């Protein structure tokens, strides 16, 4: 998959940008605040519908947007994509309500309006950034988001199940709060429907995650070993919130999907029944994929506690390289590779290894850095160099 062109209008610092991207990619150099991360962010949004850095979506819209035309603030992102068999255009329009500050997003593919679940996955990207370290050191929510993002872009059924599970969870939590003062029997009757829905979609998500990790994990291990030949073996462990022993977890990924979902569903149902009093007291669903975690292990010890920052960063790079391989295996296509100042914290040896690995892939590569010398290496010499300054793009 290739991004042939990118167009931004009133997005972040860009009033208007039209960029034609070479098939192999390009290098972007600019000071902090010049717009290079915003350009990467735009491509990421066109792939996932979400920003990897904005806490408030209205901050994505240029502060002066719409004022000259006398219309509400807006931003527009568009990209022209090519594969071996087809060509398509993606577009996202963000519209800000001036009174509330809320943002409405419109999605179009080839001019046709789509829902987010239909839009995601047309463009697939893998992002490398300094903040990726939080995949290892951050909260369980960040690791769940990582799994959900990958699986949603390669499996639209997973994305639909995730959206459905999230809505069910909201309804169930609201009901738990309203039933806090009721007796157990009345609560059981009213929760029965939502429990079954939660179990059905929750089991689907959990089994899909286990099957992904079974393929991703060995690739992660091998890439990490190539990056650090002296280190112990890097593995991962899925930590479910429902009662699933470790021995059973390893079996589930190898079973037929339907059988695995039945086993997980039965365990999930039992756990919900056991925790009913606690959930009613707290007014919240205490178990399910929304409470699970993934642990990185160096040897047999948690990487968070026993790995240096340098080793943790290598683990994240290995995770991203494994992600590329799985996406290619599942989709038979290469994702667009986005490196946002991801080389700055690597030593020369590991920087060279990463660039050699990525450059050997037939994938489009877009790299940013604050200093051009980081990107001026022989392996990247075929990629044109551009400089960004306050949203303006100039040949390097």
UniProtKB/Swiss-Prot annotation:
One of its GO terms (molecular function) is single-stranded DNA binding. One of its GO terms (biological process) is DNA synthesis involved in DNA repair. ATP binds at residues 30-37. SUPFAM superfamilies: P-loop containing nucleoside triphosphate hydrolases. One of its GO terms (cellular component) is cytoplasm. PROSITE patterns: RECF_1. The keyword ATP-binding applies. InterPro entries: DNA-binding_RecF, DNA-binding_RecF_CS, P-loop_NTPase, RecF/RecN/SMC_N, RecF_2. Signal peptide: none annotated. It is found in: Cytoplasm. Keywords: ATP-binding, Cytoplasm, DNA damage, DNA repair, DNA replication, DNA-binding, Nucleotide-binding, SOS response. The keyword Repeat does not apply. The RecF protein is involved in DNA metabolism; it is required for DNA replication and normal SOS inducibility. RecF binds preferentially to single-stranded, linear DNA. It also seems to bind ATP. HAMAP family: RecF (MF_00365). NCBIfam families: recf (TIGR00611). Belongs to the RecF family. This is DNA replication and repair protein RecF. It comes from Thermomicrobium roseum (strain ATCC 27502 / DSM 5159 / P-2). The lineage of its organism: Bacteria, Pseudomonadati, Thermomicrobiota, Thermomicrobia, Thermomicrobiales.
């Amino acid at each position: 998959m290739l991004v042939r062109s990118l167009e931004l209008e009133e997005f972040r610092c860009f009033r208007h940008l039209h960029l034609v991207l070479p098939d192999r990619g390009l290098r972007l150099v600019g000071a902090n605040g010049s717009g290079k991360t915003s350009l990467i962010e735009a491509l990421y949004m066109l792939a996932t519908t979400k920003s990897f850095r904005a806490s408030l979506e209205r901050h994505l819209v240029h502060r002066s947007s719409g004022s000259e035309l006398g219309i509400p603030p807006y931003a527009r992102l568009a990209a022209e994509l090519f594969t071996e068999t087809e060509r398509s255009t993606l577009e996202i329009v963000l519209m800000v309500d001036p009174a509330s500050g809320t943002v409405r997003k419109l999605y179009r593919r080839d001019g046709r309006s789509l829902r987010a679940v239909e839009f995601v996955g047309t463009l697939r990207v893998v992002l490398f950034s300094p903040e990726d370290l939080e995949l290892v050191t951050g909260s369980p929510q960040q690791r769940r988001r990582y799994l959900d993002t990958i699986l949603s872009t390669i499996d639209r059924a997973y994305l639909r199940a995730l959206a459905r599970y999230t809505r069910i969870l909201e309804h169930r939590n609201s009901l738990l709060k309203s039933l806090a003062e009721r007796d157990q029997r009345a609560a059981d009757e009213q929760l029965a429907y939502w429990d079954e829905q939660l179990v059905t979609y929750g089991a689907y998500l959990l089994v899909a995650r286990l099957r992904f990790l079974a393929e991703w994990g060995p690739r992660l291990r091998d890439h990490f070993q190539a990056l650090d030949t002296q280190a112990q073996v890097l593995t991962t462990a899925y930590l479910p919130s429902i009662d699933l022993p470790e021995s059973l977890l390893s079996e589930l990924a190898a079973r037929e999907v339907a059988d695995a979902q039945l086993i997980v569903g039965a365990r999930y149902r039992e756990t919900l029944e056991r925790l009913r009093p606690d959930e009613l007291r707290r007014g919240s669903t205490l178990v399910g994929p929304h409470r699970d975690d993934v642990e990185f292990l160096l040897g047999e010890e948690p990487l968070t506690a026993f790995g240096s920052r340098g080793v943790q960063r290598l683990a994240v790079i290995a995770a991203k390289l494994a992600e590329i391989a799985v996406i290619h295996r599942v989709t038979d296509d290469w994702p667009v590779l986005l490196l946002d100042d991801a080389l700055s914290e690597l030593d020369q040896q590991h920087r060279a290894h990463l660039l050699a690995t990525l450059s050997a892939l037939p994938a489009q590569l877009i790299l940013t850095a604050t200093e051009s010398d980081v990107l001026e290496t022989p392996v990247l010499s075929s990629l044109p160099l551009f400089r960004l300054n306050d949203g303006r793009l100039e040949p390097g």
